[in-house]
Amino acid sequence: MAKESLRIGVASTEPKRVKVYILEDNEWRDTGTGFCTGQCEQDKPHAYLLVRDEEQPERVLLKSKLEGNIEYQRQEETLIVWKDLQGQDIALSFEESTGCNALCEFICLVQKTFENNISLVSVRSNDDGMGSVHEIITGPVHLPSNDPQQNEETLMESLRILNENTSFEFLKNETVDFILNTNYLHTLINHFHIAEEKLLHKDLLLLSHIIKTLFLYNEREVLEQLIDDKHYMGVVGILEYDTDFPDCKASHRKCLQGVRPKFQEVIPLNDENMRQTINKTFRLQFLKDVVLIRFLDDHAFNLITDVMLTYQTTIIRCLQEGSFIDDLVNLYTNNADTSDSDLIERKRQGIRLLDECVQISCNLDPPDRSIFYKVLVKKGLFNVLDFAFNVETNSDIRILATDMIISIIEYDILLINSVRNEVDDSPFAATNEDSNINTGLIDEGGADSADNNCNGNSAVKAGESNGAESPIAPPGSRSPSRHTSDISLLLILSKILLTDQSPGLKEQAFQALITLLDPEDFMGEEYEDQSNLESLMKFYANSKLREKPSTPPQFQLLEYFTKFYEQVAPVLFQSFISGEVEGMDDQLLLRLVKLVDLLIHEHDIMLSRGFILENGILLTIGKLMEPSHIIQLRLAAVRCIKGIVAVNDEFYHNYLISKNLFDPICQLLQENLYFDNMANSCVLDLFKVISARFGQDQEYAEVSTKNFLVLNQYLVERFGPLLEKVDYVPYTSSMIQMSRVGRDAINKQQDNNGERNTTTGGEADNEEFDVMGAMDSSLASESDGENNENNEESPYGGAQNSKRSFSDIEDNTIGVEKGNPEPGLPIKKLAEEISESS
């Protein structure tokens, strides 16, 4: 009776033109052409494939019953082949593939209703023509036992069936439907509790195998059922047992029960769906990183990751659309009381929460990620950072805050500035406190105002050249003393780098500064056009442009770096400006040297050169080559000078010569003259650069000959005896040989161009001409062999005509081998020693 009711839905098919073949003596015999239909008997649950002759419809060419365990094969697109229960091989060749499709659908429908043991298999040839691929379209499916009374035998059979059913998509889909539409997981978990209570160890191991196999099905619906409230703890408990470690048992449930009270709500979460999504995300994370870490294959791992990403996207969208972030930021905006320990702890938890949200957002699609970051900045992220860097002393919390900054600027370095512009242009800009950040670095007098920040370290004082006023302004103020968010961020990071005691936090701040100060991150491919950018610089300087809502990125970049050199650089490089580096941490000095090198190479020379030369930065870098510093710092200083030389700028070259900044470099070479080490290679690499560029300048005499001619001539005249000792590389001897050619070229250029800068110390109308005059006069006096001991201070903070001989540099570290000149000898005596040793 059941079969009768099932048969009602099976309808006959439309006639389709076919050829009927019978296999006789291993040859297919054509028995005729006709029209095939799939039909069911009215009174009995029987189905047939019926073919009638196309010329004589009353003549039946074929009537084959669908019964037993017949396997029908669909070969290619138009052929159905099978062997009936009498052993006769039959084939139907359809005129069109649509006819074949209709009969295949009929076979599938019959199989699902009353002839469950028949099957339909698709057979396709491989692309290489070798062999074939079989795929089950429909057929009998063996499913695991769902009997409430499970035992070792039924569990073993269920495991075998589950593994076999992964081989074909049809069997896999049928098994998935069985799992989802029955209480199979509930049956397994119930038996797990019984087996654990009765110590049925084999049953426990089989249950663990079965659950792991379900994960390998890679079906999202099954995965979500495994982690729902009804099944998750049972599933995790089953996975505590592992056949790889049969004598051991994990403690996943104990871990979860211990973690459960630690889920804290900094701000009450009223959305129950949101709460469930967060719980599911955590459960998947725990499975992926703890429970199944040794078991998951790539497909299962990717499935869990994709589901987690979906949940995380939902979480981030819900957070930014509701009032949750506003309520969270209000903790830092309206509560300045630092004596309330509970409030301080809530603020710390809030930073942990925000950092976790930011790290989660790193996995989102770029549009979703950008929207979330903009929402954070608009709603007051800088108020949170203000607490983290100016109030909080816990280094772990400060590191998390730095992580947030780095994640945002690494994604979009202009995002903070662009959001700041949107806020400034909004009707509420006057009352927005987001850009009014206390960096704790500068007060109105240029001194530090953060006595207790950064773990009690002394802060940095800005020099008088800073000219920056206090970043603290009354709410609603639009005075020039206010720092925009991007400059406030630079000041915060500078403060961390200079004063914090955590090495990890310093390194994070350093990397963030590198990202923020690299113009390529701002401009992308547009930055490649240097000539265009330089013209923009000049136009900007002449017209005093101010940033507008429609300001293109190029002018935003100019405005940004101009503010950096006016407000941040004097603070960041204060120790280099003052020259007071004694007693400072060499690792900090090393990072500062790398930042100077970044400014020289990546920033437009019209901005960076003025700041570096006017503040005597290179003089301090020269001090860092002294033996009292670690070798890494000394070599970094040499590389910085090498980078300046490679820039091929006349101002830089003249400054290096006039301030004798090659003296400490050659002192370092003297210390390591006969050592095959990094110090020796680093200095010689500098000479190699000079020699190579000098050779190029011979070919392009009208372009840039002067700079390297002058530099080569200076080095050979001042350090010739030392260069002659470096006879194990070819380019030092080339420098000496080319100095003769260079001297002739310099004389020729001087004859053509006339005498330049005949006076020294005079005030020029333009500051740059004043600076250059000082350098040229110094160089001129050195060329004449004059050595004035009482010189006036140059505009850079150094002596104008300070010509120190190589012998004046003290050496306090490495001695030299026998035959090496002792440190402290004048050049003339050094030359005598060289001739004696030879």
From Swiss-Prot:
Pfam families: EVH1_PP4R3 (PF22972), PP4R3 (PF04802). Its main location: nucleus. Signal peptide: none annotated. Keywords: Nucleus. It is found in: Nucleus. InterPro entries: EVH1_PP4R3, P4R3-like_central_dom, PH-like_dom_sf, PP4R3-like. GO terms for molecular function: protein phosphatase activator activity. Residues 747-761 have a biased composition (Polar residues). Core regulatory subunit of the histone H2A phosphatase complex, which dephosphorylates H2AS128ph (gamma-H2A) that has been displaced from sites of DNA lesions in the double-stranded DNA break repair process. Dephosphorylation is necessary for efficient recovery from the DNA damage checkpoint. This is Serine/threonine-protein phosphatase 4 regulatory subunit 3. It comes from Eremothecium gossypii (strain ATCC 10895 / CBS 109.51 / FGSC 9923 / NRRL Y-1056).
